[in-house]
């Protein structure tokens, strides 16, 4: 895949600390989910491995508790 064919999604800054990442903080978690409802990769979010794991676990918990949808049906 050529670089021009890749998605040109703007990357997020890694200013998140691990103590703020919580499954109840839906506004923060939505920053790490794509338009289609997928969890964004570390390359896209620029998080450390520990932060990415924490975000992933929090998103999965929020999905199970129905705070976040599993898929985004709006698009």
UniProtKB/Swiss-Prot annotation:
Its main location: plastid. InterPro entries: Ribosomal_bS18, Ribosomal_bS18_CS, Ribosomal_bS18_sf. GO terms for cellular component: chloroplast; mitochondrial small ribosomal subunit. One of its GO terms (molecular function) is structural constituent of ribosome. Coiled coil: none annotated. Pfam families: Ribosomal_S18. It is found in: Plastid, Chloroplast. PROSITE patterns: RIBOSOMAL_S18. SUPFAM superfamilies: Ribosomal protein S18. GO terms for biological process: translation. Keywords: Chloroplast, Plastid, Ribonucleoprotein, Ribosomal protein, RNA-binding, rRNA-binding. Disulfide bonds: none annotated. Belongs to the bacterial ribosomal protein bS18 family. PANTHER family: 30S RIBOSOMAL PROTEIN S18 (PTHR13479), SMALL RIBOSOMAL SUBUNIT PROTEIN BS18M (PTHR13479:SF40). Part of the 30S ribosomal subunit. This is Small ribosomal subunit protein bS18c. It comes from Psilotum nudum (Whisk fern). The gene is rps18.
